[in-house]
Amino acid sequence: MKRPNFLFIMTDTQATNMVGCYSGKPLNTQNIDSLAAEGIRFNSAYICSPVCTPARAGLFTGIYANQSGPWTNNVAPGKNISTMGRYFKDAGYHTCYIGKWHLDGHDYFGTGECPPEWDADYWFDGANYLSELTEKEISLWRNGLNSVEDLQANHIDETFTWAHRISNRAVDFLQQPARAEEPFLMVVSYDEPHHPFTCPVEYLEKYADFYYDLGEKAQDDLANKPEHHRLWAQAMPSPVGDDGLYHHPLYFACNDFVDDQIGRVINALTPEQRENTWVIYTSDHGEMMGAHKLISKGAAMYDDITRIPLIIRSPQGERRQVDTPVSHIDLLPTMMALADIEKPEILPGENILAVKEPRGVMVEFNRYEIEHDSFGGFIPVRCWVTDDFKLVLNLFTSDELYDRRNDLNEMHNLIDDIRFADVRRKMHDALLDYMDKIRDPFRSYQWSLRPWRKDARPRWMGAFRPRPQDGYSPVVRDYDTGLPTQGVKVEEKKQKF
């Protein structure tokens, strides 16, 4: 049987609130909306972490960033960590990655060097884009194109943008003669609609008078929320007033523009390619936009930044919606199942096209960036999302519990409401079990000893859990015996010399 191709499209800073088919807002995302109408739309898809590098690490390695290494921005995965590209290349796929990477441990723009598992002829990270610009153009791109007048005065059209040049390369790849018996995996990774929001002037003109109504989320006084949320709001004041209207023409214009670029790539699939290509679209995280008095993204688990669009279009054209919570951690296992690639033990995710039972998913946060102390520096957070509730453990401050059925805007923190004692206990146990399962290196007894959990007992005292097999690394050997490990054991603490 002919193995399928994969076209994997992702954006940056585009949660469900920025996509028309999810939000119901007039955001002109017709190409994404059309993809949703033709495919499978996941309504409760969550990222691994609400910050760029850790989010991407989870997506492209299939394990959480706390395991793979980049638990904060500008840290690279460990040398023994395999990626989507490696798994698929070794399975005989032509693997191509075009656009923003943000996983090499360097700065925002990357080094421009293509990892060996991807096709170097198409690699186009931020550093590669910068190499095509003059110093004046670089300065304009980062800080000088903030109005209609700026765009007009500098004659900026779509050919100037990183997004357009990414799409050009993707279209070129699709137009190349097919390699006999070699299916492809092409990742198209846009920086847009992330800052600096560069797009042609005609897009910006459309949003001069557009205001996004945040509703009651703009009125959250954070009185029953964790202290670090209030400190964040004080340090980075929201631009939203009492009317609850968010005005950011550049952001909405760039959001519109990247949708058109996505359309260019999807429409470049030939009829023959479409018959055998899975198209996957998602984003790495969202933007608070002033909801809950917060801007940007960071140490919070609100849906505004953690619930992202996820759409999968099959070659057969299956159409449905899925409300069960799923995670970016599930995407690599799902793709491997479709490609008939054996999933290694180390990947905790599941094939989300086959999930039928209720389940929970985890989201984590540890630190925004290694270079600076945004959002308070080290703020360890773990979140567990089910069909009905969301539990958030903020290790250094207070916790949160939200009713996902009756409080869509996450205004009412129920963590101290005794009526939900059984709910929070079960969710707490499930989260701790999952942290145990994935070998979260930040696990400690403080996660279990929460002030609202009177029956809590310390966990993780002495157990040894070897690294699961990844399909590449040698077996893990037991320290005491020197032989291959036989799973979890509880060590007897005694002097060994």
Residue map of PLM features:
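Residues forming the ATP-binding cleft of Hanks-type serine/threonine protein kinase domains
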Residues: 405
